[in-house]
Structures are given as C-alpha cells and as structure tokens.
C-alpha cells in the first residue's frame, strides 16, 4: 500500500513536502518492541503531546502503544486493557493517576486508528484522543513528577514485562507543547510533521529493513528494534 500526500496546511500543521508512507512497524505480541530510550531526555513531563497511528490484532494480553517511565509511580502511557476491552491513557506522577479510561472496540477491527494525548501540568489539563475526537473527559489534577526517566519503549510495558502490542504502529511523534490533535489526525491521513514547532521525536519507520529507525525530528535519537520487530507494508 502506498500513501502519497502533497503539500497542504490544515489546522496549523503545515505539510510542506511531498509525503510518502511505505512502511510501518509490525509487532508479534510476544516479545517485540522498540527501544526509544535515547529520546527520553527530550520529553517534557510538564507539557507535551504524543501522537501515533496503530492497528491492533486479536490479543490475549494487555497491549501498550508506548510507555515512558521512571518507575511505577512516575510514568506516561497509552495501553489497551484486554480483559476489560478498554483503552487507558495515563499520566502518573508521584503515585497520583491522571488518566482517561473507557471501553473501546479497536481490537481486531482491521483498521488503523490515530491515538494522541496531551498534558499541561501548569494549565491543569490532560486530554486523550482517538481519530481526532476527544476520548472521554478532560482531567485536571496532576501529581508532581519525581526522578529522571529510565526508559521509553514502543509496544512494550517494561514495568510488567509481559505486556506487548500485537499489530502495527506507525508515524510516532512527540512534542514539547500541546498540539492541535485534529490537525495531527488530518481526517485520517498522516501528515508530514518535519519542521513543526515543538517536535522533539519523530519516527516514520521508512527504513524497510534493518534494526534501527531514524529520528526525523532533528534530535538524532534513533530507535532500536528488539527481538525481531519487523517492517510491514500495511500503513495508515
């Protein structure tokens, strides 16, 4: 599948260059993940946006899209809870959960979805989004983040050791500001985010082979594919 997008400017996200999307990452749901920990120092725990496209296959375990953490009491994550058939978007600081959790039908629905979350500690606002639409309600209470980040993993919850994503993940972006998520979603068409303000991590997965993915944000923090995480031609 080939997705080609020409230059456009929608909702404040300027897609300045021709945009092709040939590959995504494919996770087996057993032990595949991507280590993005070189980028952990770029993430601002006081304010930020996470954005990614993902497609979940049938799974029998909890399936994290990503987890960024110091320890169990200080972490940021998006995870699908299999037994409850729910999605959880969580910012946890000093043991205080700021989270949105609600039922979801994404498992094995055959479709890519856009997932995003924004946090603004000083502004007292935490929001979650699926396909450009706010998911559940805005949360306003935060704990105080403690400690330096230990790891940033895609498709893996290292704190449990047994939770892995099964399916595809693509077009992963991190910002150190709150972004217009409807523009990131762009009516279901991934945007070229290179050059966007606040971009501190951007992994497009266009290598197609090998065991690393380049950071297109300009920060130079490549990701490492672990345990046979593969490339796929199935893209959003």
Identify what each model region corresponds to.
Residues 30-90, 122-126, 163, 176-184, ...:
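Extracellular glycan-recognition modules
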Residues 158-181, 211-220, 224-227:
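Ligand-recognition surfaces built from glycine- and aromatic
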Residues 108, 161, 165, 195-196:
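Extracytoplasmic/secreted proteins and extracellular or luminal domains
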Residues 1-31, 45, 185-236:
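Extracytoplasmic low-complexity segments
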Residues 10-29, 51-60, 78-144, 159, ...:
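Extracellular glycan-interaction surfaces
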Residues 29, 48-58, 115-117, 154, ...:
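Short hydrophobic/aromatic patches on beta-strands that form ligand-binding or substrate-lining surfaces
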Residues 148-170, 186-190:
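Extracellular glycan-interaction patches encoded by glycine-rich segments
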Residues 127-128, 136-153, 169-171, 175-181:
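Predominantly extracellular beta-rich ligand-binding scaffolds that present long acidic/polar faces
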